């Protein structure tokens, strides 16, 4: 499997999981869905994640690509959101997914969220192997910058 086809596979699977997380039917549960307060908190978290996603997209500039394979004429971005985490787009998706989980209040979303987290972790490892080949400075950037979750107090 080529890097491009592997990247396309990861992206397709990512969209399927996001679709399932957001649009899967809300199954009836004997425990009910989220309370109004928890649902409201979930929606607020989705809004925060959406803002993070927008800033992450903008921060990549011309290096933005839907695939985990770096653009041929792209540059290693280590400023803005990328100074806090190596994969702020994935972080934003995880934040938004957590908000969806809270808003939904049903166990199927928890399972899909865990699958999405596992996929994004695998996709990030693949992407980082390609970034290391393309950008010699990536190793030192990776040593000082967390993968998904920003360090507190930094």
Where do the model's predicted regions map?
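Membrane-anchoring alpha-helices and their flanking helix-loop junctions
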Residues: 1-78, 95-154
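Histidine-centered phosphotransfer motif of kinases
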Residues: 83-91
């Amino acid at each position: 499997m080529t890097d491009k086809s592997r990247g396309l596979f990861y992206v397709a699977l990512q969209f399927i999981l996001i679709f399932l997380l957001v649009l899967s039917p809300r199954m009836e549960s004997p425990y009910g869905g989220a309370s109004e307060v928890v649902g409201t908190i979930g929606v607020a978290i989705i809004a925060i994640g959406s803002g993070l996603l927008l800033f992450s997209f903008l921060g990549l500039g011309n290096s933005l690509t839907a695939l985990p394979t770096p653009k041929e004429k792209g540059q290693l971005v280590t400023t803005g959101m990328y100074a806090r985490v190596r994969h702020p787009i994935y972080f934003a998706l995880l934040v938004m997914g957590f908000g969806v989980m809270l808003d939904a209040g049903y166990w199927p979303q928890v399972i899909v969220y865990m699958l999405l987290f596992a996929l994004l972790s695998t996709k990030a490892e693949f992407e980082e192997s390609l970034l290391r080949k393309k950008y010699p400075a990536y190793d030192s950037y990776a040593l000082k910058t967390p993968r998904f979750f920003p360090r507190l107090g930094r």
